[in-house]
Design a protein with these regions (language model features):
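Glycine-rich, flexible loop/turn motifs
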Residues: 18, 55, 152-154
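Short low-complexity stretches enriched in small and charged residues
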Residues: 19-26, 80-83, 134-136
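Short glycine/threonine-rich loop/turn motifs
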Residues: 71, 81, 98-205
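Phosphate-interaction motifs
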Residues: 1-44
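Alpha-helix initiation/capping motif
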Residues: 1, 9, 38-39, 75, ...
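Phosphate-binding glycine-rich loops and their immediate beta-loop-alpha structural context
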Residues: 29, 35-124
């Protein structure tokens, strides 16, 4: 986009930011000829420069598993609300069905549920821990690693959503995406989790 607008100051091209969520018939870019008309050769150069500048990716169907861990302080209504919120969030990505699981907030219990999801051919595993992830030796990261999983990143420089864990599990010829969900993902408001999910469901992450 910078290169397009560097061709001439007689035309301005603006668009939504990269990786924005878009819907059918939504305007994603606008073009303005500043003096209302420009030289044809300049226009051709702008068009040539704009090749492959904009791409729209469809959401892909994926088998999603939602695992929630609980401890003695976990309220049943919190678990129920998390399921409802997550289903609505995923519905915006074209996912109409998810597999739900609940277990104790212990490495052995959570590891077992993750392994079960792997065996059930999950494409994406979302884990809401009973407590926030403190470090790589916490319950959720340890449970991921016990299933031969790899931590890609712990923490994200965005608020809300900074206490997120991104990982992957290699199973046969398939890579399973894994997200240790931050507390903000229990809220329906758009946050950093949405930006990650959009990329995963479009095959970009």
């Amino acid at each position: 986009l910078f290169l397009i607008n560097s061709v001439t100051d007689e035309i301005g091209v603006a668009s939504l930011k990269s990786y924005s969520y878009v819907k059918k018939n939504q305007v994603i870019a606008s073009i303005k000829a500043i003096p209302f008309a420009i030289n044809k050769e300049i226009l051709k150069k702008v068009v040539k420069t704009s090749n492959n500048c904009f791409k729209v990716f469809p959401f892909l169907k994926k088998n999603v598993h939602l695992i929630q861990s609980r401890n003695q302080n976990t309220l049943e209504k919190v678990l129920e609300k998390t399921v409802i919120t997550t289903k609505k969030r995923l519905l915006n990505c074209g996912i109409t069905k998810i597999i739900e699981k609940v277990c104790d907030h212990e490495i052995k219990s959570l590891s077992s549920e993750i392994q079960e999801s792997i065996n059930e051919n999950a494409d994406l595993i979302l884990v809401f821990g009973a407590s926030a992830i403190c470090d790589k030796n916490d319950v959720v990261p340890k449970s991921l690693k016990k299933n031969n999983g790899k931590i890609l990143r712990l923490g994200m420089p965005v608020e809300p959503g900074n206490l997120i864990l991104l990982g992957e599990i290699k199973n046969a010829n398939k890579k399973i995406s894994f997200i240790g969900m931050p507390g903000c993902a229990r809220s329906p408001k758009e946050n950093g989790v949405d930006w990650i999910l959009w990329r995963i469901f479009c095959g970009l992450g």
